[in-house]
Amino acid sequence: MTAGWVAASTRGRSLLRRTIGPEGVRAIATAATWADGRSMLSSTAYGTELPPTADRRAARSAATASTIWQLRVLAGWLPPSSSGLARTFAAPMELGNIEQHLILLERSGDELDRSEAERRRPTSLGSLGTAWPRVGRARSIQQVRDMLARSAWGDPGGSDRAAIILGLRVRWGRRLVRQAPITSEWVQGATAVLVARERFTFGRTIHEMAARDLDQLVGPRWRRATSLDHLVERLPRSAAWPFEATVAASGPADESLWLSEHAVVERVTADARRLTETGRNSRGTVSAVMALLLIDLWQVHAAIESAGRTPVPQEVFDAVA
């Protein structure tokens, strides 16, 4: 055990005390108005620089920037040879930037309101970027793919936005398993849910490059599945566990996939909390801290969208957020 892992684990536990957790998230989500929700957010680590008139987009950006800062702090404490760990956990934010850039490229033939383009400003990743901001200079979807292929992401495959983003999500799963082995079953379960969404909700064919990456994560038998139930039967146990909730639900299985998504979040949260509470100082502990930071951010984003809108039954919000 090196001093770097001890320092990063200790610092990580202190950062977790800055998250707002389920109760704080629920309070923002059930605020009577967006102004009330924004005021609550401003009193947390996510809103220290949030303008008093900020809209939801600005609030999401502020929350994301806060989490990036936390990951950068942790990266500074890691052993020099392990800097890729923080970069891997920052990948969802980089994916968000890439997807927004692809959307703008798709609309390049249309009139794009200047103020809208300004509001879509990408998240600054600093040293945590893998291919960003270079990809942001691409002027076509093919150029995006080419630039990604020359980066640590590798070629995601596909020729349109949906295919490229799918390829990157699967590639992120493989990066996670390499950098943070404790995430292996989390990644396998989440990947299986992703396959189910693509195949049986969106009805999309998964291109071969992404399919080969999927084979590495959940085995090749998913390829012959013709229904969600068939898919679950063909998955290894290490990947099929999120679907226990779906099987127990009434109604069509593919309409209950949100329960499987929730099962992934619950499992990751519970496992990661246990790891951070063991008192051990290790790569696994730091990985668990980073996972919990991402989950808290995701839940805060959900709360921002819910604040001041039609009330959602508590049990539904708890599941989705």
Feature-to-residue mapping (PLM):
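N-terminal domain-start signal
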Residues: 1-321
